[in-house]
């Protein structure tokens, strides 16, 4: 663990929102457990990602933390209590956005949010402001049954924010969204973090996780096989090489690679910089996808 990671871990002590220790769960009649001995913590104001292929145990873990599944082994506490120990006040403090939309199809988007707002005892957000934030203002008074899947996904996300939750559970938050609307959702998530909210997301989209998450855990067959910040995971498995694209003597684009160790004293590297027009310089960094495949031996399918 780096000095920075130790500092982050130290700062997390006393501000833990989620603590999971030895968590196991088996569905009735299932041959194998869906979750096997998971251990992790999530600190206040952190975006934590549980990453893995379909069937890895991500959504099951999330459902256990939300309180939708019971009878697990080990410990899974939120604000120092198991979800089953909380009363209705637990759901006043959390927001949930499921991957599969579940709305009242014969109500409008606005009416759906108004209805769900009425279920909370505390103050709630303005439905129109939430709809505008996710790009649905023009469709606020359209029946949800006429919404596309992507529109329903955005409505689900907006609904999860209606009670201004302290802790947000997101399941594949950008799945099926076009780049413009996916960016809207990502920007809202980043803003929530800046306001001190805690976000627990599950996804198999490594690019989204890399962009948003402070830390990620790779999950395969119900087990966590790696856990760290995306940057640390990538650095640990990156090739220490620099790739330079430059214009050759004839004007064509040429490429050269140099080792990072001793780069400051590499005469060939300095010759390229001095004598050619450099277009790009990049370290040969592994992607989070690359790291996942290397660590787990699995593809994200």
Curated annotation (Swiss-Prot):
EC nos: 7.6.2.-
One of the record's GO cellular component terms: plasma membrane
Limits of the ABC transporter domain: 18-246
Gene Ontology MF annotations: ATP binding; ATP hydrolysis activity
SUPFAM superfamilies on file: P-loop containing nucleoside triphosphate hydrolases
Matching PROSITE patterns: ABC_TRANSPORTER_1 (PS00211), ABC_TRANSPORTER_2 (PS50893)
Keywords from the UniProt entry: Antibiotic resistance, ATP-binding, Cell membrane, Membrane, Nucleotide-binding, Translocase, Transport
Membrane topology field: Peripheral membrane protein
GO BP: any one term: response to antibiotic
Gene3D superfamilies to which the protein is assigned, alphabetical: P-loop containing nucleotide triphosphate hydrolases
Keyword Nucleotide-binding: yes
Cellular location(s): Cell membrane
Residues that bind ATP: 52-59
Family according to the record: Belongs to the ABC transporter superfamily.
Protein role: Part of the ABC transporter complex involved in fluoroquinolones export. Probably responsible for energy coupling to the transport system.
Subunit composition and interactions: The complex is composed of 2 ATP-binding proteins and 2 transmembrane proteins.
The protein's name: Fluoroquinolones export ATP-binding protein MT2762
